Amino acid sequence: MVQTGPNIVTPANFKRCGINHLNLCLKEKAKMFKNLHNTTSMRTRMIGLFAIITLVGLFAFACGSDEEAAAPAPAAAPAAAPAKEESIAAQYIGTLEGPATVTDSSKFPSSFGEAPQLAAMVKAGSLPAIEERLPVQSDLLVIDNIEGIGEYGGIWRRGFTGPADKWNGYRCCTGPDHVLFWDYTGDVPEPNVAKSIDVSDDGKVFTLHLREGMRWSDGVPVTADDWLFWYEDMYGNEELVPNKSAVSGINGKQGNFEKIDDYTVRWTFEDPYYFFTSVLAGRTDLGGGQADRGVVGKGSFAPKHYLSQYIPDIAGKDAVDKIVADEGYDTWVNLIKFKNDWALNPELPVLTPWVTVQPINNSEWILERNAYYYGVDLEGNQLPYIDKVVLTMAEDLEVMNLRAIAGEYDWQARHLNMAKVPLYIENQEKGEYKLYFDTQDAGADAQWKVNMAYKQDMYIGDLLRDKSFRHALGASFKREQLNEVFWLGLGVPGSSAPAPANLYSPGPESEWRTKHSVFDPDKANAIFDELGLDKKDSDGFRLRADNGERLVLEITSRTAQFMEFVGMSEMICEHLGEYVGIQCTVNAVERSLAGQISAADEHMFEVAWGDGADHLFTFPGHVFPAGTNSGFGSALGLWFQTGGEKGMQPSAPLQKVFDNFEKAFGVPEAERIALGKEIWEIAIEEQWGIGIAGQSPASLGVRVVKTDLGNVPSRQYNNPDTKTPGISRPMTLYWKTEKNRAPQALSYE
């Protein structure tokens, strides 16, 4: 029960706080609600951290509209205060910007610089000259920085949550090593690991030109043989990759990959594949790179000279069996998955700007500069500028946010909680950092995912697969209240539909943002009654129609994440009990365990991510079950991946989504857009993912950055498909003052 009174905030008091008046709103609420009390367990846990910080910070998170402020403005208050606050808000949401990939070879540098430690190694004869470690001049990756040329040295301090947090490193520190990659707007594929791509007029042949002189992090040259090895001996191995990715084919027909010469490879398809360049830029099985996708045998390239020794067909079964036994693995497949794991194996040759030297299964995950990285700035200085990245494990989300508030991280957005924004604002000067908001176009920063393949309890599973039941759930909870508590009122409550400006937006916000996504307990209760859930027990909870027992739903939720999924789940459960008479419990588990539960289809629901869905065709897993880890049903994703050979047969609407998705890759843009819009129409109507709120910085967009860091964008495109902050090319970050850029000892010196 929530106390009420003149100085008490209740859910009914919450109003939306406009972003342009955020500071004013927070200050007013700090004055109004110093005596705020809330006795619910979820709220108590959520603000537990605040108790050890200032009183103003403690109570500022519950912000409301300007009209809600009870205290009259002082007589001397300037009339232009709102305009002033708008300029303050501009500190947090800046202009979208980022570094540029230079493609005009006339601007490529002809002389080169390197970190002082590497120069010393060259002088000592323990490292080849910089010219020998970089690609030939015409094949360099040249980056035009946001601010200008940087300085070498220093450490980038970050936080991570443990061995399951590999995405932390994938985003910050892999380059990213995609085959192609997005420009800073997230719209245009550009050269990256591949120097360039030629596309035939009929859209069937894609010729990739590699960078002559590029080297793996151990100094061995990268050639087309590494790509062919990946295709034939890893991706083509049925034990390692039993199910081929849909993106390596079109219209159900797999493409053919071949080596043309030492620095040229080619994909050929039977049908036009107009979207293939975007596939190679995105976080897909082909485009996503070795560091991220290599652990599952995907990613388009792999170090042949290193990984061949672990493949029985190349090294011989007896030799590989001995290694498997000596290193304690059960199969060669699990052995090579470890050997090709960027986050776990320091010996792995890679193409990333930093390489793992102390793996992720330690309290500190440590990365060091790659002496053979192929990227330079406009003056020829080899990137990265910063020597080391040190990620320190935080046992939970509260500890990580406390460290960020205290200024212990240099650039961090991952795992930072939107509810702590008042404290970040208050402590900027003391912590020597600046706060940035990186908003995104996804309609649901977080969504309530329904497992349509749930069979642990067939009665409940059938309810979950009933669209009417999902519609009733969507009308059973107050999104506005969740928005105020977990988004500070800055999100857009409603369905999972992407922002109106998105290419694939299904239509007007007035229709698709609210469709099946407005709190309407009368409607919800009527639907539940019609579904045979009209009987209740003495406590007012609905009873199952099959056995007369109480209906109990369970939401699986990940702990220690960058949004308060557990708190959201608890509030949704509270609303289900209060407004529609359904008992709901929360199963709060660690991320890796939650992934295992999801993969086994043992969960009924998840409250989890929805970000990235605006990149529909390269990051579809938060829209429908495009894979076995979407949360919507692993068995359905397996059906999609195997073309119906394995898994669970989808409903007719979901099959239509599958068909549209596969067709879209081989049609011109206008037709692809139409297919994408229809996918969203079906997804919103079917409500596999029940939207909560989105289009905000809540998911990895609350960014704190040390004021001494250079080449920092005022706003960056925020999307997992672009591996933000990877889209801002963190290898261009540098420390402006000498106190922070002392040269760091490198393990290979």
Describe the function of each predicted region.
Residues 211, 228, 339-345, 367, ...:
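Ligand-site clamp/hinge motif
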Residues 139, 348, 354, 358-365, ...:
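Detector for C-terminal structural segments
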Residues 246-333, 712:
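Surface-exposed binding/hinge segments that line
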Residues 64-72:
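Bacterial lipoprotein signal-peptidase II cleavage site
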Residues 59-62:
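C-terminal motif of bacterial Sec signal peptides marking the signal peptidase cleavage site
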